[in-house]
Amino acid sequence: MAEHGESSEDRISEIDYEFLPELSALLGVDAVQLAKSQEEEEHKERMKMKKGFNSQMRSEAKRLKTFETYDTFRSWTPQEMAAAGFYHTGVKLGVQCFCCSLILFGNSLRKLPIERHKKLRPECEFLQGKDVGNIGKYDIRVKSPEKMLRGGKARYHEEEARLESFEDWPFYAHGTSPRVLSAAGFVFTGKRDTVQCFSCGGSLGNWEEGDDPWKEHAKWFPKCEFLQSKKSSEEIAQYIQGYEGFVHVTGEHFVNSWVRRELPMVSAYCNDSVFANEELRMDTFKDWPHESPVAVDALVRAGLFYTGKKGIVQCFSCGGCMEKCTEGDDPIQEHNKFFPNCVFLQTPKSSAEVIPALQSHCALPEAMETTSESNHDDPAAVHSTVVGLGRSEAQWFQEARSLSEQLRDNYTKATFRHMNLPEVCSSLGTDHLIGCDVSIISKHISQPVQGALTIPEVFSNLSSVMCVEGETGSGKTTFLKRIAFLWASGCCPLLYRFQLVFYLSLSSITPDQGLANIICAQLLGAGGCISEVCLSSIIQQLQHQVLFLLDDYSGLASLPQALHTLITKNYLSRTCLLIAVHTNRVRGIRSYLDTSLEIKEFPLSNTVYILKKFFSHNIKRLLEFMVYFGQNEDLQGIHKTPLFVAAVCTDWFENPSDQPFQDMALFKSYMQYLSLKHKGAAKPLQATVSSCGQLALTGLFSSCFEFNSDDLAEAGVDEDEELTTCLMSKFTAQRLRPVYRFLGPLFQEFLAAMRLTELLSSDRQEDQDLGLYYLRQINSPLKALTTYNNFLKYVFSHPSSKAGPTVVSHLLHLVDETELLENTYKNEDYVNHPPGTSRIMKGLKELWLLSPEYYSSFVSEHLLRIALNFAYESNTVAECSPFILQFLRGRTLALKVLNLQYFRDHPESLLLVKSLEVSINGNKVPKVVDYSVMEKSFETLQPPTIDQDYASAFEQMKEHEKNLSENEETIKSIKNIFPLQPPKISSGYWKLSPKPCKIPRLEVGVTNMGPADQALLQVLMEVFSASQSIEFRLSDSSGFLESIRPALELSKASVTKCSMSRLELSRAEQELLLTLPALQSLEVSETNQLPDQLFHNLHKFLGLKELCVRLDGKPDVLSVLPGEFPNLLHMEKLSIRTSMESDLSKLVKLIQNSPNLHVFHLKCDFLSNCDSLMAVLASCKKLREIEFSGRCFEAMPFVNILPNFISLKILNLISQQFPDKETSEKFAQALGSLRNLEELLVPTGDGIHQVAKLIVRQCLQLPCLRVLAFHYILDNDSVIEIARVATSGGFQKLEKLDLSMNHKITEEGYRNFFQALDNLPNLQNLNICRHIPECIQVQATTVKALGQCVSRLPSLTRLHMLSWLLDEEDMKVINDVKERHPQSKRLIIFWKWIVPFSPVVLE
């Protein structure tokens, strides 16, 4: 066997690129880009993985077992993949062919695994039907014996002779040594890997690595004389006892089976279907309504079997259905015409020859034919228990054979396979579930250990009395029917050991019926009959070879005596029983069970498998289904039973047009199913739903999803009521008291929502009050959008005119519950939420921390959307409008809210909104941090010398730069797969023409953009034309303005603000800006270019109120301003930053003409005209912000005018120096008059150092102070004064205290400060950093004092302490404090420098 593997050039593509545009539209990403990136990663993984023939995975059952941990959110089932030769590698989602080593990472809705396999590796010998040792999942080790060994039996008495027979032993079986096999008495037959004992004639095959030939010999043929001559009876007994599965089963049970068929050994083309067997397909046409037997034969050869409905035939391989077959049609041509991709038709030989060829390839040799199915008519082929009996004594045997044939005939009929589920799900019959493997775990009654089982493992372990438990609709009936069908088909060798299989429904029997009577009534039909005596004799003779499949078990008390005895006294009959039991009823039968099987949640891959069966013509809808549940991870478990899947199918049939795949539709369909099933008990069902809803509601708001009997009783739920079992499950295993759960957490929320709607819609006031009580438990936006998001969605799916206004009003008031906001975020834990919800919750929390304003806009938009949807669903828009209008008043919302229907119906409501914002984000990735600039700032510093214990206080900049670079690449790749989508303006307000009301103010944020494309331009043209005022905020977006020129020219009179940062303005763009007559605010910052044309013509903006120019290091800005610049009479904000010397004369004149100036920031280095500047500033009584930096400042003139600014809120002089004490004292005194001051950044200098304590005491006169900063000037005395003022009642509103770079403070001074600081209830940010040369190595007492200080600051979220050298013990103290802090989840401590050098570490 040649090694198969991928070379470095052997790249494969799993992607169907022709379908990617459709996927791009659904996902909103560039699927082609994503696919290419994904293929590259997968190729790298392939290159690492081991290649070559894997003999350990030639067993399909073993391959199937590898998928136990495989993600179920896939479009291929494990059964399909295992049948196609694949096993799960454990590397991501990679699957690999055992034969050709093909590795696949993806699934496909359009291609089956076998189709993908054949396309990518047509040369695979497994696919070509060659003998590569594949072992079918239902195959067994025991083989039919040869009539005569080659050369005669006597020839092989000697071990060496036996060993010589293994000359052509197949490569795939080399894991089992021919020498060991020959020593155990076996001779190689020459057929596959089948060996035969020279003594007893027993034949075994399917040898795998690790098999013990002696153990296999002893298990299957314990009476062999050669075996008994070599092994003691105790050894043989130990071999048998230690064998896994097949209890009480020997080889003769399989060899003498009455239901044996010749099987195609290559399962790859069979799509896991028993109808790969041509004979079985022929059997399905027994009830074929057409006449021509020739046509039937042709249909069978074309791979088709009869479904039993309306003349419809179906292909066993591709699943395609055809009907209206007429005389003269060529079924193969018709099959190929409608289903050209069918693998069965694409096999190397013609379709008519494929299956016979597969069968003949693996056919049993002639010597084995005596035990094939032809032995039904062979009088010589008799059961081993009949040998030596007389004709009359063997009567039971003939009856048993006849009974077996009748049973098989019944089970293979379409009427048995197809059992319609109740009316609502009539389209989905059990025959569509036959091909699905349910997920099963095994629970041995005497052992608490549970283990997952594959279906082959279940079949191997059928013995004694077992049950299969599951929820309502979990697939118990289908599972039992599948066993009966597989047995009858003869296509499941694992079931050959059963001569009789009885599938009995216990729901339609009476206690007085005999067992034979039940069998005749349910299974044998009008012509069949068997006596009780004969049946008893058959069971007594066959014992373990009889399997009872008992469905609809409800309790021992209702059973006839015969069945009661079979269960409770199984040691008498020794038959096998598998009983289907609802989870609630297991307890009553547990003492009689050996093993309990439990059906777990129906895998989502099975759901997709079934949907593909029904909707293969609508792949787009299937794709949308996969995308929906991929994007809503928390919903993936809702299809937990086949019954829920049936509800999905029903919904799709009833709503053939594309609908959103909402979980509400699923749950509603399920409730409809219950109402149809229990038509005669409508009132009891309604009462049960109501009481269960109350329990669900109570549990939901106490985070309880498990309940006991007391909980049920309190809610009025009858735990013994059968209807309750349709909504809840009972769990009793390993528990003193039973535990009850709803069918799923989301289903509990659905029932709770039904109950809440019922309460709010009630005519009883106490019910309404109770409903309102529960509704008010949702007391924050975070809870509404995360914890109770699904619950609210379900509430809205039950619209109620009474509940509508109440719910809408409550939701819209949540945004303004500011007093609850912080506590909610502090206490709400997302560990116990589903992954998707937890991620959203974490993201919202981070958004709130980073930008409370954006957070408010986000939650406002989402709550408004939710509330409006409910108002429309409940038809209460008019009643809700007062709440809606109140909510809209003065708010800033996202532009997309205008797509809501409300703004089409009530466009006048738009006038209440403050503004609407729209963000346009491009795919450019700007450099977040320029490390070269940081490195330059450290050039003059010498690396500090520190002890080894403190080395962790410094981290290498290169490592951070590397990580940041990698992150930037990741962000770039992510951005590349998300194509820029223009804002959607397709519904709601945008349907109005003309627009009766305009958007009061449109805020347009543009980031990382290049020129806009035509689609975006068209959208902006429409949006701009509907806006009364437009404000731009552009960043890193050179060329964007020019690209939207047509939109700006149409609406230039509406543009009132333009803020531009880190972009280059072309001359054309500067000219374009100059055509905006209504511009009131202009900001230019951080650009490498001086937009001289724009600045030369600033006087043309006659209404300009705000001018911000931040161009450090650029040519003199003030010099390029026009002479007419001072004539701008409406200036309210003036912020100029330039590091060049500047002429202030124009600026002074402008201020002189600006009586309404509120904000003044200036940074420049010009030293003249300062007096005139101060003089003119003194007249600006309305100033609220003043900031001076650079050399253009004289302290005394400014201090003299400072008391004039009684409206001042922000004073920033942090970069100015006051050298003399007199000026500094005067400054300190003046501060007392600024009673509205909120931010004070104190100047530096010796003079300020001398009066620092006075400045601190003056802060007692500043009750509004939120920010206070001292740099370089504090010492031990002045810093302790801050603590004294705080304890005296000052700083009550202080949020930020910046004490960095105060190197005059000693460690003792800090320790005293920490010990004294208290009574700062709102302090969020404390900065005590030092320069690197001033690193401070602190004692344990200081660290302890710092920890105690932090504990007394309840609102602290940021502590900056760079250059504080902390060892491991110090950090333990700090971290312990952090863990106990009220803001533990938000508190961040900055204590590590990121530097371009390594410190000098002392040994």
UniProtKB/Swiss-Prot annotation:
Gene3D superfamilies: Inhibitor Of Apoptosis Protein (2mihbC-IAP-1), Chain A, P-loop containing nucleotide triphosphate hydrolases, Ribonuclease Inhibitor. One of its GO terms (biological process) is epithelial cell apoptotic process. The keyword Lipid biosynthesis does not apply. It holds the Pfam family NLRC4_HD. Residues 464-758 form the NACHT domain. Zn(2+) binds at C315, C318, H335, C342. ATP binds at K476. The keyword tRNA processing does not apply. It comes from the Eukaryota. InterPro entries: BIR_rpt, LRR_dom_sf, NACHT_NTPase, Naip, Nlrc4-like_WHD, NLRC4_HD, P-loop_NTPase. BIR repeats lie at residues 63-128, 162-228, 281-346. Keywords: Apoptosis, ATP-binding, Metal-binding, Nucleotide-binding, Protease inhibitor, Repeat, Thiol protease inhibitor, Zinc. One of its GO terms (cellular component) is basolateral plasma membrane. SUPFAM superfamilies: Inhibitor of apoptosis (IAP) repeat (SSF57924), P-loop containing nucleoside triphosphate hydrolases (SSF52540), RNI-like (SSF52047). GO terms for molecular function: ATP binding; cysteine-type endopeptidase inhibitor activity; cysteine-type endopeptidase inhibitor activity involved in apoptotic process; metal ion binding. Interacts (via NACHT domain) with APAF1 (via CARD and NACHT domains). Anti-apoptotic protein which acts by inhibiting the activities of CASP3, CASP7 and CASP9. Can inhibit the autocleavage of pro-CASP9 and cleavage of pro-CASP3 by CASP9. Capable of inhibiting CASP9 autoproteolysis at 'Asp-315' and decreasing the rate of auto proteolysis at 'Asp-330'. Acts as a mediator of neuronal survival in pathological conditions. Prevents motor-neuron apoptosis induced by a variety of signals. Both the BIR and NACHT domains are essential for effective inhibition of pro-CASP9 cleavage. BIR3 domain binds to procaspase-9 and the NACHT domain interacts with the NACHT domain of APAF1 forming a bridge between pro-CASP9 and APAF1. This is Baculoviral IAP repeat-containing protein 1a. It comes from Mus musculus (Mouse). The lineage of its organism: Eukaryota, Metazoa, Chordata, Craniata, Vertebrata.
